[in-house]
Amino acid sequence: MRNYPGSLHNHTDFSNIRLRDCINKIPDLINYAIELGHEVVAITDHETLSSFIQVEEYAEKIKEKHPDFKVIRGNEIYLTRNNLNAQNVNKDKGDDYYHFVLLAKDIEGYHQLCELSTRAWLRSYVARRMRRVPTYYRDLKEIILPNQGHLIGSSACLGGRLPRYFLQYFETENPEYRDVAKRWCVYMRDLFGEGNFYLELQPSHNPQQIFVNKQLLEISNELGIPYIITTDSHYLKKTDADIHEKYLNSQDGDREVKSFYASTYMMSTEELESYFPYLSPAQFETAYNNIRAIAAACQNYSIKRPLRIPHLPWLAYNHNVANIEFYLNKMPSLRKFLASKRSADPELVYAVIDGIQRHQDLQNDEAYEALEECLDMTWISSEVNNAEWSAYYLNLQKIIGECWNAGTIVGPARGSGGGFVLLYCLDIIQMNKLREHTKLFPWRFLNPARVSVLDVDVDISGLKRGQVLQHLRAVYGEDRVSNVSTFRTEKSKSAILTAARGLDLPPEEGQYLASLVNAERGQLFSLHTMYYGDENDNIPPSSTFIEEMNKHPDVWEVAQKIEGLICGLGIHAGGVVFNDEPFTNTASLMRAPDGTIVSGFELHDLEKCSLIKYDLLSVECMDKIQICLELLQQYGFIDSSKTLKETYENVIGVYNIDRTSEDMWKMVWEHKITSLFQMEQQSGIQAIAKTHPTSVDDLATINSVIRLMAQEKGGESPIDKYARFREHPEQWEEEMTQYGLTTEEKKILHKELDISCGLSIAQEQFMELVQMPEIGGFDLQWSDRLRKSIAKKSPKDYEQLTKEFYENMRQKHLSEHLCSYVWQVLIAMNRGYGFNIRPTMQ
């Protein structure tokens, strides 16, 4: 009995990044292919390789259960004549964006796909309301011909060049079109190499497709070019056709999709063959054997690579340090770096010494001790993670210097890096934690026990972002710098709106139905949660939502199917990737809708193939500061002869600005300072009015407190409790007394929490508390588990940690009063939202 091996031309929702096209998700497509008894499936989205990591990971996931099933990765490109662009396109002369399918046989084939896709996207342009991504014939010739045998090509659907020749023959009966089609086939066979070009038949009752299929069979016999049968799947099952139609029509109601996509779904052998009454059993067997031959020729290669920090150009450091032994003795870890075989490690030694010599506030034993701690953690993490973190630091040091050179101011510090003195030493941040009152911990930035990529938030002026990126490309290379892409998805609300549009409901009706979706802290509930509730998070079903969806079963059906689908391409808020080799050695590049160059992979997939991002965040308040400085210079209020960095440091540098000015703090209280960082919202304005901060530490605390929620509905809000304890410190004393704390136990908490008036309002605070011997003596790894359970709002994990916390208390005979107060009052407050404190140290 014959068995259709599987379709080598299929789409997933990654095909939606330019135009709504497909409702298949990767797991569903692969699972259904297996369910149908197929042996292979190829994923060939419309001019994008963005699914490749996720496809590989899902193929790995099913490998144990289905070891013989093969997943092939490819790309459906738009093949055009050479030099086609928006200005010279002429459909009357046959110009169009002809579909053509490419399959990668191995890792070299993948690299060729990366180069082809990148060329198409970088030359792309907007025409007829969508971005066009043309691949020229010369691209195929330049990339494939010198190194044949790594890519397989097939002629694609009716939108392909070869089928179009046949359709012209069908419409005119002019044999010249058939002759041109034959010559085109010979050209492609020679270009790809023997056995690497295939003719593609597709199932359809459409007379045009049937004619093309028959012509392909004849050409195959005449030229000896093999043929295959594919389904060009845009949805999974025949029963999904209506949902697919509604999804496509939600974007353009005039699209004729019913007939065009009538048979573009996954099929069983029996259903597939029913579309081909004109094929003999032998012809089916030939097509199926050709599919198996392609599957056998395609390797199970991996594009994932271990983390590798690029070696970008670094600053030049003085290697002739006269008193180097002094520094090696003060910071013994430097000796390991100096002797290391990792090339960046010795350079870091000289960079650190250079930084100490430039920073007077680092020339003391406390600073040497703090730097030694950072260096030791860096060394351990580099060894454990096999990552050259020294290169990361040196890269970032120069990148920030180039940002200044490009004409933007750079923010002093934000994120967990504020607690890492080494970053201050290297001028990556401008804040020395040793000079601040709020306790900041280096392990929040780099925890040797945690395998994760380092991340420093660098704030720049959004107004200067374009020129900054242009400057960075000039310094590091046009093909070495890229923004990080993001992919928009259909969230629950947008899924309802999209479904309503596709079903041609009145706009106000769709808006009403979408408005019924609830959210918590900015996160929309899923459709499933709205309809069925979520027992784990104690969220009941919404009776109103259920009632309305039952009134609109068609909306409910369509919305469920499209929720979660990728529906567009975007740009990461700050992520920029730097490389020390051409991007196409690792991944492809694309353009966002506004033309910005972005990576072919989103952030997490980039990291899986060895690339890491550096965060250059555009911040509105930085724009205003920069404009103010420029105006002050322009009108002669400050010296205009100095560099931007010198001016910034002299006028408003972290340790030059007067932080104690009573007039300034009065302006803060009265909301007369615009764009006060992260205090612009009403919650921040109200919190400042209630508490009257007088220091940056106060602002940092307030910013953390306003993100927390009351533990009980209707209970006292954390900001009200903070204001109360701040004005009446004795009330904190009374609360501790009520929990039975002794004077000594109160002293322990005063030491840690006086800065925040008795509240544990940040992740590092409660992590530090549970590590204290009197409270738990837990290690950093356990406290990080606690952080994750709170940050990810995981009740199950938190419940397990609660058991471990109290069991540890009993085993170590710790104070039940102190431990209970810490767990039930201080830590519990963070369960609404555990924020880290450094964002507001800016």
Q: Where are each of the predicted segments found?
A:
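Alpha-helical scaffold/interaction cores of sigma-54-like transcription cofactors
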Residues: 1-842
